[in-house]
Curated annotation (Swiss-Prot):
Keyword annotations from UniProtKB, A to Z: Aromatic hydrocarbons catabolism, Isomerase, Plasmid
EC top class named in words: isomerase
Protein name (record): (4E)-oxalomesaconate Delta-isomerase
Domain of life: Bacteria
Example GO molecular function: isomerase activity
Catalytic activity, reaction form: (1E)-4-oxobut-1-ene-1,2,4-tricarboxylate = (3Z)-2-oxo-4-carboxy-3-hexenedioate
Function: Contributes to the degradation of lignin at the level of the protocatechuate 4,5-cleavage pathway. Catalyzes the isomerization of the double bond between C4 and C5 in (4E)-oxalomesaconate (OMA) to (3Z)-2-keto-4-carboxy-3-hexenedioate (KCH), where the double bond has migrated between C3 and C4 via a 1,3-allylic isomerization.
InterPro entries: OMA_tautomer-like, PrpF-like
Biological or metabolic pathway of the protein: Secondary metabolite metabolism; lignin degradation
EC code(s) of this entry: 5.3.3.-
Amino acid sequence: MPRRDRNMDSAPCMWMRGGTSKGGYFLRADLPADTAARDAFLLAVMGSPDPRQIDGMGGADPLTSKVAVVSKSERPGIDVDYLFLQVFVDQAIVTDAQNCGNILAGVGPFAIERGLVAASGDETRVAIFMENTGQVAVATVRTPGGSVTYAGDAAIDGVPGTHAPIPTEFRDTAGSSCGALLPSGNAVDVVNGLPVTLIDNGMPCVVMKAADVGITGYEDRDSLDANAELKAKIEAIRLAVGELMNLGDVTEKSVPKMMLVAPPRDGGAVCVRSFIPHRAHATIGVLGAVSVATACLIPGSPAAEVAVVPEGARKTLSIEHPTGEMSCVLEVDDAGNVVSAALLRTARKLMDGVVFV
């Protein structure tokens, strides 16, 4: 385990729910500059490695063991830089190998609350550079009277109640981690005897039919997590595709995500059960949803074979998941390439103070 600086035993922090995840939001200046010291500090903050994370702030779940590191940007046209860090629950690992579109939902409000971005009218647009992949997202935050409000009438599945909407636009996300939308160059690859699509439109994913790995694709999260045979099968595929996806050895990485697709049951475009990567997701990650939605548009792919895709250049695809759905709006050009994606998220400030280790 990395050793942390014993002189650093606390830091200012805001704990927020972002989308269907939650975690700690820090200003970059409030964390150790040295990466190893920073990671050791964050492991202590979360209480990792420990399956219960009992001595830290983590919630014994990858979805609640996340960190956003935010700073004012010096890039033209960008307001803030955002680094996402996934803190493993039961291993002493902190990784920046992926983005998180759910935690991203809290970055705009946090930046305004911390004075990195000035509120401008009833709505404030915040341009966010995602350091993990070098891409840009623009979040629109409600700021009536010059202050962030978290109250509103927007609902997202997986989160009780309603909150202020935070629409977020993504552009140029294709190949953000893998170098190409289809890093292997193929719409379909056969891995361990199964047809899969290796895709990266903001999140590296392996998309395959649920039926091909012996499930329906409609199981609940607990059933999936209890299925050791299924998890071993998809983990073998995940490890086999690391090099094909230009990700190298993915043994200790949180990508690629594993997406098991089935025909929609509730009027959506496709039904998905996702692994992140070793545990089933309660919903689906934002950028994972973008990648799956994009896969639905690729002729001959496993996703396209089960999906119901609307017509038109602007397509709204409802991605069904274990606790509801997530709608992803894709814009395609004349050649059928996805040029932008937009999703609706919400966020809420849970705590603002000092975290101790």
